[in-house]
């Protein structure tokens, strides 16, 4: 009699357990198809390779097709075969974050890669919604980055999101290292997405240095890692930055690069059956990018200032990823290969760069000085060919004469060695001295 009373509950328990299990039926490229278990999009699953040795690969539900789950693994698919059991954990990917992550190098799911141990912390979701627009504080304070050309002419505010646009080999990573060492932000969170393995240690030891690493967290997903890890690394870094923002900190989030995050999303989208749209990018790329970028910015507690490098394909500044990023971000710093060839570093093209919040956070005097410097650059650039071939005669145009007189001092102000550091007030004083006459 008692057994009969509890039979329906026993059956329910068995049904619930077995609904959490499924079986691999197909593997094509990056995608694993399974029949069952019951799951939702972004649920985390275990694909059991050897139950006796407790050997399993973690995977995420990235889509559905004909009543089958489409899974993408966080690791290589070696060892996974048809018939492997799939277990649903029942929750999406979350990461353990806390003050213990500072000074560490982590992979895309917050596992230390430097041999360290992270203690304590709380779990933050990797996939999170941006703050409510009405809860965001208005950007009203300058965030000094310690680079004269940026602080003086493309001034960045706390909570701003700005892109660093450049082709390959023009100095994006070096500039990020200068920002990380010189910034006045409380915490640096650095995401190296799709980088060459050789460059990771170089960036940490040469560009970032011991001084920068003390208050930094570095999240690394090199180019050989699966697309899902590269994609999640960008979101994991953002989740870590969100944790520190919620503690009332001013965080500088630096991501190198947004382009490789988009390429990883392209791999995931195409493998899930999305159609290619513009230059092979599926629609999800254009929805995932704003979701990622909007998570940075101010909140009612602290701020995340986002610096995102964008690798400009073939130096074409109108290609889809570059154009989309530029339309979402609050400004852009353009690095010029032409300036790099002249040994002008950082190779920032001031006339092509803009900070959309500078007018609201800089003083009137600062804005006037920045405008005068840009006028000198613009005037000289227009007349440069005539000057170089000797066709321009001094005295023909007062503005050109003034630009010729000032151009060397202007270029000296715009150049900066990687080991040089300036306080914000020093930078403004140097800008004033340019135009004292």
What are the roles of these predicted feature ranges?
Residues 152-153, 159-437:
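P-loop NTPase catalytic core
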Residues 1-104, 109-113:
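N-terminal accessory targeting/assembly segments
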Residues 54-55, 93-97, 112-117, 134-140, ...:
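Active-site phosphate-binding and catalytic loops of NTP-dependent enzymes
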Residues 4-9, 89, 145-150, 237, ...:
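Phosphate-interacting basic helix/loop segments used at nucleotide- and nucleic-acid interfaces
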């Amino acid at each position: 009699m008692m057994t009969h009373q509890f039979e329906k509950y026993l059956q329910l328990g068995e049904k619930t357990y077995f609904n959490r299990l499924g079986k691999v039926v197909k593997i094509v490229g990056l995608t694993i198809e399974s029949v069952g278990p019951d799951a939702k999009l972004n649920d985390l699953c275990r694909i059991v390779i050897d139950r006796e040795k407790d050997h399993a690969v973690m995977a995420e539900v990235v889509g559905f097709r004909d009543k089958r789950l489409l899974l993408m693994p966080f690791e290589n698919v070696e060892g996974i075969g048809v018939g492997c059991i799939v277990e649903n954990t029942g929750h999406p990917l979350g990461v353990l974050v806390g003050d213990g992550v500072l000074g560490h190098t982590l992979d895309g799911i917050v596992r230390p890669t430097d041999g360290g141990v992270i203690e304590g912390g709380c779990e933050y979701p990797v996939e999170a919604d941006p703050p409510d627009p009405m809860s965001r504080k208005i950007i009203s304070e300058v965030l000094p980055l310690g680079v004269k050309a940026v602080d003086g002419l493309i001034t960045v505010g706390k909570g701003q999101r700005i892109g660093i646009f450049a082709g390959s080999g023009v100095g994006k990573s070096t500039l990020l290292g200068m920002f990380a060492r010189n910034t006045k932000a409380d915490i640096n969170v650095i995401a190296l997405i799709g980088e060459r393995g050789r460059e990771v240690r170089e960036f940490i030891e040469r560009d970032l240095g011991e001084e920068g690493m003390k208050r930094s967290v570095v999240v690394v997903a090199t180019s050989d890692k699966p697309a899902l890890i590269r994609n999640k690394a960008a979101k994991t870094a953002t989740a870590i930055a969100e944790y520190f923002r919620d503690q009332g900190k001013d965080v500088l989030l630096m991501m190198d690069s947004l382009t490789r995050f988009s390429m990883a999303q392209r791999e995931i989208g195409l493998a899930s059956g999305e159609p290619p749209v513009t230059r092979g990018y599926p629609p999800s790329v254009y929805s995932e990018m704003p979701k990622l970028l909007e998570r940075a910015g101010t909140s009612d507690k602290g701020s995340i200032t986002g610096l995102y490098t964008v690798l400009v394909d073939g130096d074409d500044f109108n290609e889809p990823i570059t154009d989309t990023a530029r339309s979402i971000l609050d400004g852009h710093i353009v690095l010029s290969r032409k300036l790099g060839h002249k040994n002008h570093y950082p190779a920032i093209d001031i006339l092509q760069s803009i900070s959309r919040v500078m007018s609201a956070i800089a003083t009137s005097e600062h804005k006037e000085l920045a405008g005068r410097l840009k006028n000198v650059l613009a005037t000289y650039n227009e007349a440069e060919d005539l000057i170089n071939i000797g066709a321009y005669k001094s005295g023909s145009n007062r503005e050109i004469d003034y630009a010729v007189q000032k151009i060397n001092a202007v270029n000296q102000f715009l150049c900066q060695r990687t080991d040089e550091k300036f306080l914000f007030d020093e930078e403004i004083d140097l800008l004033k001295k340019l135009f004292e006459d």
